[in-house]
Amino acid sequence: MRGNFLIFILFCSSLYSEVIDDPFEGFNRATFEFNESLDRNFLKPVAQAYSKTPKLIKKGVTNFFNNLEEVETSVNQLLQGKPLKAINDLSRFVINTTVGIAGVFDFASKIGLVRHEEDFDQTLALWGIPSGPYIMLPALGPSTVRDALSRPFTSFLSVTFHMTEADVNLVLK
């Protein structure tokens, strides 16, 4: 009797086992191995060297890159129907780019302008576009199909996408 019950339980549990399908499994596994190698051989040594950088300089670098994201965030706020947040984020960019010396200092936060993070993937999600399957992107890591397809638009909105060598030289002088 006990044996029949055990067989019955095993049979029932196999009926309801869920098969999780990864349509990009081969690509994802190969890309994961590539990313692991990239991390081990390049990114980890760079990160270890950067960890020795003084906190004040790290904060300035973080502020600089956060400032560059403000324009993209502002556009996505508009696309999501949040005009007041868009004005806030664009104001942050103008203030931090000018008074904050190219965004190295975050004066906008000091005067009460809150930092937001929005990207085109979030905009597409708000519009009802499903995320799609998981995908591992080379050098960028885990993502979804929606996020991966939103990245070119996000890059186009990035300030750095539109910078020329002359712009960089002007800033560095």
Show which residues each predicted segment covers.
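Sec-dependent signal peptide recognition
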Residues: 2-8
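N-terminal signal peptide c-region/cleavage motif recognized by signal peptidases
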Residues: 12-17
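Amphipathic, glycine/alanine/valine-rich membrane-attaching segments
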Residues: 18-173
